[in-house]
Structures are given as structure tokens and as C-alpha cells.
């Protein structure tokens, strides 16, 4: 693992790279203006070793047109001292940038993890698609020798949606991201509920209780089957 990541190591075009001597971000400047508790501020200071602006994905560098809202995607490396990620502060900063710029500036975090890196994004709520509150999504770990971060889309709005999809769903499709996230999260929740009901059913001794749990299991299994078919159908349409 190199001492420092660069935009090109991540698969981003060299034209988007911020020069190393200009990319360092002071911690104080990062959380200044955020409404965070003293405890969160201390956690942020203690957990983060350094912050570096690696790249700026904008129309003037890439030639990709601005989106309806999105004009810039800042790619920020968050180098940790240990394994704990101060997710609450990273979410607050991304939310703050989003609100202050009227959704024009988004943040893609890149977090080195020893053997590769993870990405993280803040995604706003979208109640109509089943996302009831905005939150930070963190990807699985990626190796540096793979394809890296991909810029996909006809404008920066789609590029942002694709980056969110790469982070939350492990694919680059920019279509129906919130809907697909909501389906994936519902599947995960129902899968956990299915396992809980199976365990409870195996332990139950009374016939009435076993029948009740079996009926609940059938309902959960039916919904899981429906959602998984919907997820597959959506993937085929978007592919």
C-alpha cells in the first residue's frame, strides 16, 4: 500500500487531480462551521490522521456537462489513525457542503484501509423512493489493482449517482439509485428477520406458537422473493 493515494491510482483521469502541495486540508477548516458536539469534535481529531483533496470532478476539467444541481464532486482522502471511522462528522460535513451550495457540491470520501480503500458518500433522503432519511454509505474494501473508481454518466448529476451506486450497491449504474438502495436495505432487514423467525420457530414447543411463527416466516419469505425478483428485474433494465 503506497504512503499516499493519488487520483490516478484510484482510476480517475489525471486532469481531475489536485496537486499534492495544494491538496492538504487542515482538520480545523474541515469541521469549522459544523454544529457538532465537543465529543464528536474530539473523536474527529483523535481518529483522523490527515485529510487531502485528491481530485475535483467538474465540467471544466472533464468536459462532462453540469447536472441539474451537481456542479462539482470533491474527492477527499480520509486517512485514519486506527480502524474507527468518525462517520457522524463526515456525514455532517458532506451534508453541510450539500446544503450550503444548494446541492451543487458533493463529496466522495476515499478511506485507505491498509490493503486498498473504501469509499463513502452522503445520500439525501428520498421519501418517494423509500429513503426516509439521509445518511452516509460506506463501500466494501476495494483493491488498488482493480478497475478503481469509474466516472459514468452523461452529466455530473449522473456521475454523482453512479459514484453513489458504486459505493452503496457495488455497481456503476446511475439509474434509480435511491429505489435500488431502498430495496437492498429492505432485503437485508427481512433476511435478518427471517433468520430470527427460523431460530424462534426451531425453539418453540407449543403448536400454536409454532404455527404463528411459521405464518410469519411465510409472509417474510414471500416479500423477500418479491423484492429479490424486483432487484434482479431492475438490474436487467439498468444493465
Role assignments for model-derived ranges:
Residues 170-187:
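Short, charge/polar-rich alpha-helical segments
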Residues 129-130, 182, 232-235:
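Peripheral peptide segments
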Residues 183, 187-204, 220, 224-227:
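Non-transmembrane amphipathic alpha-helical segments
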Residues 1-112:
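N-terminal, leucine/charged-rich tether regions that mediate assembly and partner docking
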Residues 219-239:
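Amphipathic alpha-helical coiled-coil segments
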Amino acid at each position: 500500500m503506497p504512503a499516499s493515494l493519488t487520483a490516478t491510482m484510484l482510476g480517475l483521469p489525471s486532469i481531475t487531480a489536485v496537486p499534492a502541495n495544494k491538496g492538504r486540508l487542515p482538520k480545523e477548516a474541515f469541521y469549522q462551521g459544523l454544529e457538532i458536539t465537543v465529543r464528536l469534535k474530539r473523536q474527529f481529531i483523535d481518529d483522523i490522521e490527515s485529510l487531502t483533496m485528491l481530485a475535483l470532478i467538474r465540467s471544466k476539467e472533464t468536459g462532462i456537462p453540469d447536472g441539474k444541481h451537481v456542479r462539482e464532486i470533491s474527492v477527499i482522502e480520509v486517512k485514519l489513525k486506527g480502524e474507527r471511522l468518525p462517520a457522524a462528522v463526515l456525514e455532517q460535513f458532506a451534508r453541510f457542503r450539500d446544503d450550503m451550495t444548494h446541492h451543487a457540491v458533493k463529496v466522495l470520501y476515499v478511506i485507505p484501509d491498509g490493503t486498498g480503500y473504501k469509499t463513502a458518500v452522503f445520500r439525501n433522503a428520498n421519501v418517494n423512493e423509500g429513503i426516509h432519511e439521509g445518511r452516509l454509505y460506506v463501500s466494501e474494501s476495494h483493491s488498488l489493482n482493480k478497475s478503481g473508481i469509474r466516472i459514468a454518466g452523461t452529466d455530473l448529476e449522473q456521475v454523482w449517482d453512479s459514484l453513489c451506486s458504486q459505493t452503496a450497491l457495488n455497481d456503476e449504474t446511475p439509474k434509480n439509485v435511491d429505489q435500488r438502495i431502498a430495496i437492498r436495505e429492505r432485503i437485508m432487514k427481512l433476511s435478518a428477520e427471517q433468520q430470527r423467525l427460523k431460530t424462534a420457530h426451531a425453539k418453540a414447543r407449543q403448536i400454536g406458537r409454532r404455527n404463528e411463527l411459521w405464518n410469519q416466516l411465510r409472509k417474510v419469505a414471500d416479500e423477500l422473493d418479491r423484492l429479490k425478483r424486483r432487484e434482479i428485474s431492475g438490474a436487467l433494465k439498468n444493465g
